Structures are given as C-alpha cells and as structure tokens.
C-alpha cells in the first residue's frame, strides 16, 4: 500500500500551560486536497509548522513524504512547496528574480532555474510583470507569485496556510482556479482556511478543528448531510430567544448566534408562511453549508 504523503498521529503541542494542538490525527492521501478548517487560534498554523519540522511536537508522530518529522524534515521539505500565510517575497527583486533566487536554494543551475521562469509566470498569469518589482504588484498578484515560487522544485506536496486571506473576490477565485489546475496535475494539497466557501470548493476532505482538537472529518458534502441534512432559514430581528420559543415547533433544530436565529427545516413552507408579513423581521432561506456545520458542532459561527 502506498505511503500517505502526510500522516499525523495523536500529535500534541503545548506553549507553556496552553495545549494548542490536542491529540490531532489525520492522513492526507496522494492527489487529494485536504483542508484544516477552523477559526484563528484553532491550532492550524502550529500544525503546519510541526509538519514542516519548524516546531517540534510534544507527543505523537508525524510523517511527510514518507519521512519522519522532525528528524528527517529537511530531507522531506525537498519534495514540498509552501505558501505561507503572509507573503515573504523579496521586495528588492523583480518577479523574475524572486523565482530565480528561490530555484538556487534548491541547488538548481542558473540554466535550469531560467528555464522554469517562463512556465511559472504563465501559470501565475504574471507574464507581463516579469520585470516588475514586488511592490508594484497587487495583493492577488503577490499571492500567485508566492504560489509559483512554491512550485519551483516541482513538489509532490503543497502546503498552503490561509492562501486567500486579504484577497478581493476576483483575486480569490483566480487563486482557486490555479489550485484546481494543480490538483488536476496530481499534486497533493494541504490547506488551512477559515473561509467556508474555499473549503467547499477545493477540499476533497476536511478536518474541522476547534482549540486544537479534531471535532469532525469528512467530505464537505458528507459533513453537511450528516450534521445538518436539511435547509436553513436565517431570521434576523430583535429578541431571537423569544422568536425561537415561538418558531421551534416548525424546525427540526434551532441555533442562536448574535441577533440571528437559525432554523433547520425539512419542509420550509410552514415556517415561511408563519414569517410572511411579519414587520421588523428579515429572513433568508438557503441550502445548508459548512458554516452551519461549524455552528452545529461548536455553538458559534466561524470568526476570522
């Protein structure tokens, strides 16, 4: 049986008295996109740092590309491309030079590094920016350049930490399209995100993390079906607790978050009829999504 590119087994990490990763286990299979989904502070970035050997676990075992981590992390990283949460491009270099210099870090000859530049610029849709300084690029261009740089060594595995944070919707969608093209080429991707839409669009499977613990795992559609399994009506108005007392008979389940009442309904029509014509209330009827899964599992909405 082939060795999984990424394997976490009962991993723990403490910083002082705080347990930030708590018995975390997951396996990423070759060619899939696996997501770590959770709010800021859930332990996602610490998990990636341990995977790459940059932070040592206090318990458990980790393997990356078949190599034990941290003891063989340096060797494993030769087969990995990394897109960090914050761009660390060299501002003194042009777009082209950022790629060339990174190629030399992997021991490439100048000729080999130069041969990579054109296809990587085309992949990142930056052909017209080859000689521009990093400071001249938009946020989306910088993220695509960081992704292109992560591909210099033709990695088997890509590790991306919040790859579209801070991007506008158009730039985010272009980044997703580029990542899907990499999956089509057989790359294995591990991604952390707190964007529900990103997780639903990209991930074959995902792990929902809260306070360093895995609280759910599976394909996005399977999690939505198993945890919710029906439509949702969001009701916005004053005093959601009183609203819940009035409307709970029309729903399978209800949740309150802030000023919003979430009603999970198999048949939405009786509740919609009840709400029709009510002044001071607004409501939205929609299919269930991963935000509902997170709310159901944790009792709160995802926070940035």
From Swiss-Prot:
Keywords: ATP-binding, Cell inner membrane, Cell membrane, Membrane, Nodulation, Nucleotide-binding, Translocase, Transport. ATP binds at residues 38-45. Residues 6-236 form the ABC transporter domain. Gene3D superfamilies: P-loop containing nucleotide triphosphate hydrolases. Coiled coil: none annotated. GO terms for molecular function: ATP binding; ATP hydrolysis activity; transmembrane transporter activity. It is a peripheral membrane protein. GO terms for cellular component: plasma membrane. It is an enzyme of class 7 (translocase). It is found in: Cell inner membrane. Its EC number is 7.6.2.-. Part of the ABC transporter complex NodIJ involved in the export of the nodulation factors (Nod factors), the bacterial signal molecules that induce symbiosis and subsequent nodulation induction. Nod factors are LCO (lipo-chitin oligosaccharide), a modified beta-1,4-linked N-acetylglucosamine oligosaccharide. This subunit is responsible for energy coupling to the transport system. The complex is composed of two ATP-binding proteins (NodI) and two transmembrane proteins (NodJ). Belongs to the ABC transporter superfamily. Lipooligosaccharide exporter (TC 3.A.1.102) family. NCBIfam families: nodI (TIGR01288), PRK13537.1 (NF010060). This is Nod factor export ATP-binding protein I. It comes from Burkholderia lata (strain ATCC 17760 / DSM 23089 / LMG 22485 / NCIMB 9086 / R18194 / 383).
